[in-house]
Structure formats: structure tokens, C-alpha cells
Regions:
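A short acidic Gly-Thr/Ser loop motif
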Residues: 6-12, 76-77, 201-208, 214-217, ...
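Short loop/turn elements that form and flank the Walker-type P-loop nucleotide-binding site
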Residues: 195, 207, 315-317
């Protein structure tokens, strides 16, 4: 069975074609990354240009995999999303738990409720409580007096989803399934033990930083903040009056969130604005890192606030996994 996944990010468009077979690992038939500058904070700057780029990526992927692409699974960013944790309790008077009881609990819950201008992206039972004992598997077959279902619902703005869907409607490609972008990112880097024992995965992207929380092989939470590695690049460019190209190079080659006594003595020559005059000046490495550190602190603090907002910090999950381009910043794993 052929499956196609597409991710339209703020710096690149990605497409993967895979062959899913029973009792074996997926076989990757094609993987395409294509740079784009036509998206800013998940909004299309030029619809026609981004449509042409996506068409080009799909064509390359189809040619590379020797398949005809008619439908896709599409990643959807979750910046400005809303998460709901809710439950539903029923009394079954020491009877055997049956599917009928689960359906009753679902029907009397907020499972089918939605907010105006939002679309439900994920909505499922995260755990069960049988007489106050938490279960993560199906409780059918147990005797109990009280059954409680704990749900998680993730909603994204309809306009965002319709914008992305409309792109593929014009290309006459069917969107088979919508997938939260942080979930795709986490599944690519977390192993079975990570997902089972508990893990927080933070994806430090170019224009946003997303996070997911896994435990007992279930997604407990997904969200994102609108700050990414591009903000660090812009901070450097403004802070030392250099070009964006130079700032990106400085961040990659010299950037760190950890200070060292030698930073004061490591001198770097950089072009200054306006760049067309070809003028240069010298700065030390600590100047760059003093710009980087506050932005990284702000980003991680916003992520921490998201966890506290939904009381997820109380789960005391210790396993933290970093991914994305920003995770390559020196010292961030030890910060």
C-alpha cells in the first residue's frame, strides 16, 4: 500500500512516498526536500508560487518513486491551536464493563462538541479509570462500580486548514488525512520506549517551536509557539548590524548557549551594513552568544509555560528529546 506524506514548512516543502507492507518496516520509495521562501508564519505570501513549488515537489516525488500520486497525508501546523482535556464518568453498579458502557460515556461527554471557526484535528480516549485505578488499555472485561474516560481533543483554526486544503484542491490531489506537524516530527525521532515510558519532544524549527508529550504510547499533548531559529538569526543581524546571510553563518559556526572564558578572546570578522560597500568589523564570540542566549531562554520558557498551563509538568516526565535545525545549536542539549 502506497502512502504519501507532505509537509509545507516555513523554509521547505517535504514529500515522502512509502510502501507500507504487513509485518515489515515501511519501504521509502522517495524523499524530497525543496526550499521555499513563500511562506511566513504558516501564511502563503504568494499562493501561485507556493502552488507551483508544491506541484514541482509532487512531480519529483512521483517520478522518483515511479508512482502516481493522487492522495496525500498532510501535516498541519498547530500554532494557535486549542487543547482540551475532559472526562466522562458513569456508574455501572459492579457490573461487567462492556462496549455499550464505553459508548454511553462517550455520548454523554463533550466528544462531539466543537468551537466556532475551529476544526477537530485529534479527539480520542487518552486513558480510563476503573474504580479510580488508571488504565491505558481497553477496560472491557473488568467488573467495576465507576468507569471514567479521560479524553484529549486538539483543535485548529478552520481557515488555516482550508488554506492548506485549497492548495491541493487546485492541484486535484485528495487530502486523505490531516496530521499535526509536531506528531509527525516526534514519531520520526522517538522510539517505542520513549513513547511508552514518557517523553517530551521539542522541535526547534525555523519559524516555530513545537512540542508533544507522549506516555504509555499515546499522544497526551501537542502545541507550538511562534518563535524559531529564524528569530535568533534576525536578532544577531540586528544586534551587530550585519547581513542575514552573515548572521546565519555566525549562528551556525560560532553560536552557543553556553559561555566560555575564551569567548571574549575569540575574534571574528563580519561584514557590516550596508553590505554593498564591502566594509568589515571585528567582534568577539561572546557578543554573538549574548544575543543568542536570551532568545533561547524565551523560547524554552514559552514551552515550559505551555506544559504548566495544562498541568503536564506534574507528570514529571524526565526524558526530553530535541529535534529540528535549532537543536544543532551548540550547548542547547545541556542548557
Amino acid at each position: 500500500m502506497i502512502k504519501v506524506g507532505v509537509d509545507i514548512g516555513n523554509s521547505k516543502i517535504s514529500c515522502v512516498v512509502s510502501d507500507l507492507q504487513k509485518n515489515s518496516l515501511p519501504k521509502i520509495l522517495s524523499f524530497i526536500n525543496y526550499p521555499t521562501s513563500n511562506i511566513n508564519k504558516n501564511a502563503f505570501i504568494n499562493f501561485q508560487l507556493i502552488k507551483d513549488e508544491v506541484r514541482h515537489v509532487i512531480t519529483l516525488a512521483a517520478k522518483d518513486s515511479q508512482t502516481e500520486i493522487k492522495s496525500i497525508n498532510l501535516n498541519i501546523p498547530v500554532t494557535d491551536s486549542i487543547s482540551f482535556f475532559y472526562d466522562s464518568k458513569i456508574e455501572i453498579e459492579n457490573e461487567l464493563i462492556m462496549d455499550l458502557h464505553l459508548k454511553k460515556a462517550i455520548n454523554q461527554s463533550d466528544f462531539f462538541d466543537n468551537l466556532i471557526n475551529y476544526e477537530i484535528l485529534m479527539n480520542y480516549i487518552a486513558s480510563y479509570e476503573v474504580d479510580n485505578k488508571k488504565l491505558f488499555g481497553n477496560p472491557v472485561g473488568n467488573f467495576a462500580k465507576i468507569l471514567n474516560l479521560n479524553f484529549y481533543k486538539l483543535m485548529v483554526k478552520k481557515n488555516l486548514i482550508n488554506t492548506f486544503k485549497n492548495l491541493f484542491y487546485d492541484l486535484q490531489i485528495h487530502v486523505e488525512q490531516l496530521v499535526p506537524t509536531p506528531l509527525s516530527s516526534a514519531l520520526a525521532v522517538l522510539n517505542v520506549d520513549d513513547r511508552d515510558l514518557g517523553a517530551i519532544c521539542i522541535d526547534l524549527g525555523e519559524a516555530s517551536t513545537s512540542l508533544v508529550v507522549f506516555e504509555h504510547e499515546k499522544l497526551l499533548f501537542a502545541d507550538a509557539v511562534s518563535i524559531g531559529s529564524k528569530n535568533i538569526t534576525n536578532d544577531i543581524a540586528r544586534g551587530i548590524s550585519t547581513t542575514k546571510e552573515s548572521a546565519e553563518r555566525l549562528k551556525t559556526l560560532y553560536g552557543s548557549v553556553l559561555s566560555s572564558p575564551s569567548d571574549e578572546h575569540e575574534i571574528i570578522e563580519i561584514p557590516i551594513l550596508p553590505s554593498e560597500f564591502g566594509q568589515f568589523k571585528q567582534i568577539n564570540r561572546s557578543t554573538i552568544n549574548n544575543i543568542i542566549k536570551p532568545r533561547v531562554e524565551e523560547t524554552l520558557e514559552l514551552v515550559w509555560q505551555k506544559l504548566r498551563q495544562y498541568n503536564l509538568h506534574k507528570r514529571k516526565i524526565k526524558n526530553l528529546v530535541l529535534t529540528g535545525g535549532g537543536s544543532q545549536l551548540e550547548g542547547i542539549a545541556d542548557y
